[in-house]
């Protein structure tokens, strides 16, 4: 049985991201796997290649030119065999992992020229959900402290439109729960920390490091605006951010998709800080400005605008939520955060946005009818409880959402399909059953071509 955020059994809509790190096998991000319409790096799983035979790999045993041609194919094949990937980094304490990655990046990066040591941190994210959390915020604070104390040639600054004009170096990082095989599946046992430094003046990746932290020492509670966000979908801007860290190596060009959205990212960072501090009018202005910036049409911008309007008690919140739904349908995947009573198919009333659930359902139903969409409604749960119980509960909750949508728009009858997958498609997978893995307890709506 699942529990919700704040000890409730919650079914929530959400989404996630794919990660692969230097020194680790590449992995497929759930968003990429289930979202063919959204471009993302092609995933692959690396396997260790068999070691070459000594006769083919050492000068002493290499065949002479006059040797029989029968040995040449084997020799050529051995020479073409790629080396086995290095072992994963050891698991260590949270602070030690952050220090290890930070020291490696700043030590290995080419020294900055005089008066050119500015480095900005593009806020780190969870490598699956794309959310910022207490853990990622703590990492940023630790990086800032370490650089100030030990790398005086650098000056860490906040990411802002003004600072970006100076073409500084930029830090990008992901913090991802993984299992014993370093994969984002099954029981998560540690957090994998990827940290990359890019040089905006050259457009190149100049340093990278990977470390692992013990899962028990990590606080993955989402930051305020992410904790409150009602909707998740596969977002190209966040996928580009994650790929910049996970799918890169030193010397690579920084991905253009990431660079195109940097101005919007700076505005979103400032807006998130304002929201966290309760400055909702300023947050609304910044999110609205970000929406008009290049590559500014992002889920976190739409979420931020909606939440700021809710906090300001403005009537425009209904239109803002409709924009969220439209964005999700255009991405072909919409996850909405509904909190249910423990073991029940009825909504809980403790969530501060629960009073808006009726409006959410009305807008989702209206958009589906307007777009003449058929919908697949899929319930999800965290891994807590038996598989059979989770499968049944996730289906019942999907069917409840289905019935509510059809009540609001009778035209949706015979155009929706309900399904439950239990915990088989977890995004976070930590099993904490709190706000940090709320995305695993989601109800997901996806437009489908053929009606049931």
Predicted regions and their residues:
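Short, solvent-exposed beta-strand/turn patches at coil↔beta or beta↔helix junctions
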Residues: 82-96, 329-363, 382-388
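C-terminal/domain-edge helix-coil "capping" segments
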Residues: 21-71, 79-115, 199-292, 297
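Conserved small-residue packing positions in alpha-helical repeats and bundles
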Residues: 271, 305-306
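Periplasmic OmpA-like peptidoglycan-binding domain that tethers envelope proteins to the cell wall
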Residues: 130-137, 143-145, 350-352, 380-452
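Single-residue signature of alpha-solenoid repeat helices
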Residues: 283, 317-318
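Periplasmic peptidoglycan-binding/anchoring modules of Gram-negative envelope and division proteins
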Residues: 94-113, 345-378, 406-407, 445-452
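A short, hydrophobic beta-strand-centered structural micro-motif
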Residues: 104-105, 118-124, 149, 154-198, ...
């Amino acid at each position: 049985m699942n529990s919700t955020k704040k000890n409730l059994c919650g079914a929530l809509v959400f989404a996630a991201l794919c990660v692969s790190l230097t020194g680790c096998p590449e992995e497929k991000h759930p968003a990429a796997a289930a979202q063919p319409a959204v471009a993302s790096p092609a995933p692959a799983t690396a396997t260790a290649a068999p070691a070459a035979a000594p006769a083919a790999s050492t000068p002493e045993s290499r065949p002479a030119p006059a040797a029989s041609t029968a040995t040449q194919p084997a020799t050529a094949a051995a020479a073409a065999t790629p080396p086995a990937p290095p072992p994963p980094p050891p698991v260590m304490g949270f602070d030690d992992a952050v220090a290890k990655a930070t020291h490696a990046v700043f030590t290995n990066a080419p020294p900055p020229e005089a008066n050119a040591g500015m480095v900005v941190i593009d806020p780190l994210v969870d490598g699956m959900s794309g959310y910022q959390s207490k853990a990622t915020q703590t990492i940023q604070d630790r990086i800032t402290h370490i650089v100030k104390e030990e790398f005086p040639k650098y000056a860490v600054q906040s990411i802002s439109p003004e600072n970006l004009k100076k073409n500084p170096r930029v830090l990008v990082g992901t913090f991802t729960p993984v299992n014993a095989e370093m994969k984002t599946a099954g029981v998560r046992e540690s957090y994998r920390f990827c940290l990359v430094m890019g040089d905006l003046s050259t457009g190149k990746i100049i340093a990278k490091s990977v470390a692992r932290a013990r899962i028990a020492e990590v606080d993955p509670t989402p930051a305020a605006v992410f904790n409150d966000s009602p909707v998740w979908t596969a977002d190209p801007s966040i996928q580009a951010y994650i790929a910049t860290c996970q799918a890169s190596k030193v010397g690579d060009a920084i991905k253009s998709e990431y660079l195109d959205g940097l101005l919007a990212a700076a505005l979103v960072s400032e807006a998130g800080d304002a929201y966290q501090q309760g400055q909702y009018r300023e947050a609304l202005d910044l999110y609205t400005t970000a929406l008009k910036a290049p590559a500014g049409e992002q889920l976190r911008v739409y979420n931020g605008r909606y939440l700021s309007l809710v906090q300001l008690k403005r009537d425009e919140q209904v239109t803002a939520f409709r924009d969220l739904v439209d964005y999700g349908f255009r991405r072909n995947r919409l996850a909405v955060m509904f909190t249910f009573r423990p073991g029940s198919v009825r909504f809980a009333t403790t969530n501060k946005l629960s009073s808006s659930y009726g409006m959410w359902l009305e807008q989702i139903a209206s958009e589906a009818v307007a777009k003449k969409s058929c919908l697949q409604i899929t319930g999800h749960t965290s891994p807590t409880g038996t598989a059979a119980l989770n499968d049944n509960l996730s289906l019942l909750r999907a069917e409840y959402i289905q019935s509510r949508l059809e009540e609001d728009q009778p035209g949706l009858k015979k155009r929706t399909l309900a399904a439950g997958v239990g915990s088989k498609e977890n995004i976070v997978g930590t099993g904490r059953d709190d706000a940090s893995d709320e995305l695993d307890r989601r109800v997901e709506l996806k437009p489908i071509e053929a009606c049931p």
